[in-house]
């Protein structure tokens, strides 16, 4: 049973954005919200359940409690709410109220029990019913027990129950309303929870200012609808960090200057769009392979292999002779 109460409490404690939790009824005074639970439990379990209910909106931070009755209007409102759950609009089950003989001077929500409480009891202190107040009757007729708290047997708690008074004259409507009684706290009864009402929050306005997320003006935290910072992404002017909508650095380029890769101009690191070095060539000078003059490393204008003016040095003297003699010998040999 206690597990069931915990589940119910988790459901009713969800705020709805209104002034009362879900399925609670606001009192005519606007100060409280009530809900009747037609679950028969011990007084202690009913009290613990109500204490898990939280108020909605910006209501007081105190938790809920079993209902405390402090006026004839409130007494009748709670009764009508409970009676509305029956087919004949009369209470079918007695319901626990938020007081017990363990702390007789106060209701369980901390409000004084005297002089505004116990109005449903007869002033004689016999704990029997007292004819209830009805709408239109003067509130001054609400009996108040001016004495110190009674000293009934310990372990008792009040219940609200239906009352039917037979008309005194033919044609007079019966007096239907609540009366209270003291019963053993170990008895099983239904109960009524009360929680302070919060201020009604207009739809779509979350806590903060002007319907926006916490911050100013409907924007994300910061200023002016932007991401944190000023007007844009962090930094200045709607851009990425840095200046002017560009990547970090200056002028929309990659880090460095201009639109180029790091360095100067549009080239790779170095100068003039070429590979590292000068003039668009491979490392070296003049577009040639390393060395001078477009040739293989070495000197001369030919595409020969490394060496000086001929084939690479070879142990065969034939290959070290001038090309003209080599070609002549080739012609003679071939012929």
UniProtKB/Swiss-Prot annotation:
It comes from the Eukaryota. Embryo spicule. Keywords: Disulfide bond, Repeat, Secreted, Signal. Residues 199-335 are annotated as: Disordered. Transmembrane segments: none annotated. It is found in: Secreted. Residues 207-310 have a biased composition (Gly residues). Belongs to the SM50 family. This is 34 kDa spicule matrix protein. The lineage of its organism: Eukaryota, Metazoa, Echinodermata, Eleutherozoa, Echinozoa.
């Amino acid at each position: 049973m206690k597990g069931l109460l915990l589940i119910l409490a988790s459901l009713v404690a969800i705020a709805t954005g209104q002034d009362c939790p879900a399925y609670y009824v606001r009192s005519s005074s606007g100060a409280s919200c009530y809900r009747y639970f037609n679950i028969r439990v011990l007084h202690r379990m009913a009290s613990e359940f109500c204490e898990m209910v939280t108020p909605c909106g910006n209501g007081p931070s105190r938790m809920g409690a079993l209902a405390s009755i402090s006026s004839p209007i409130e007494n009748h409102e709670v009764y009508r709410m409970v009676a509305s759950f029956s087919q004949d609009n009369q209470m079918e089950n007695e319901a626990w109220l938020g007081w017990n003989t363990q702390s007789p001077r106060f209701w369980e929500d901390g409000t004084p029990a005297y002089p505004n409480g116990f109005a449903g009891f007869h002033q004689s202190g016999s704990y029997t019913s007292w004819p209830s107040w009805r709408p239109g009757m003067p509130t001054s007729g609400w009996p108040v027990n001016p004495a110190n708290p009674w000293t009934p047997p310990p372990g008792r708690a009040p219940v609200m129950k239906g009352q039917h008074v037979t008309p005194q004259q033919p044609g007079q409507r019966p007096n239907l309303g609540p009366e209270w009684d003291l019963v053993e706290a170990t008895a099983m009864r239904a109960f009524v929870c009360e929680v302070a009402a919060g201020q009604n929050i207009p739809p779509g306005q979350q806590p903060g200012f002007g319907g926006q997320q916490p911050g100013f003006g409907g924007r994300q935290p910061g200023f002016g609808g932007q991401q944190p910072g000023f007007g844009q992404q962090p930094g200045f002017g709607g851009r990425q960090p840095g200046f002017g909508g560009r990547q970090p650095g200056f002028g929309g380029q990659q880090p460095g200057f201009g639109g180029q890769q790091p360095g100067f101009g549009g080239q790779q690191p170095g100068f003039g769009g070429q590979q590292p070095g000068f003039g668009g060539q491979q490392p070296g000078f003049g577009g040639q392979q390393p060395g001078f003059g477009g040739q293989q490393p070495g000197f001369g204008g030919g595409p020969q292999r490394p060496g000086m003016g001929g084939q690479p040095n070879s142990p065969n003297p034939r290959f070290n002779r001038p090309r003209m003699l080599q070609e002549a010998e080739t012609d003679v040999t071939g012929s």
